[in-house]
């Protein structure tokens, strides 16, 4: 057997494992490989062949698991938004006050960003592609539901005297949301553990930066 033929056999054997690996495991492998590629190269810059090579399957075999490249993108984003929604619902169901709800929403937002770094990058960096291929509306629809968790807690906190009433709930919500999601690009973010960074952000939003305010 020649070396070249042996390499071809090994490659064929490696990629044929998609026939023996369970479907859930194979789908997860494809999703993981695709997410990293999309985040690094952009969705438009990633080909089906790229995904197949990264996942260790023939590109034609991908269609047994996903109808298209965009179907993979849609599932990655759906997983991201579904995780956020589930975590927010749990916080809302278990927290004892609006302050604790907001504290929990801050913590869980940062948790999701850490658990889904590639999907987060896709959502932030590929919005034009997502919009052009009708992939953005499902995400925006889910975002509107998530937004209500924030606004309901902020309004309730203001009514109960826990939060200021001279700052519109929408302004506070957008400030917190945009700041949290932008932290993926902060070079000093990695200096803190998730718990430390969550507490730092909570302190900043709740207590501000001034030690003494001039009246």
Residue positions per predicted region:
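Helix-loop "lid/cap" segments that line or gate small-molecule binding pockets
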Residues: 91, 107-114, 124-129, 204-208
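Amphipathic alpha-helical packing segments from all-alpha helical-bundle domains
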Residues: 82-89, 115, 133-160, 170-174
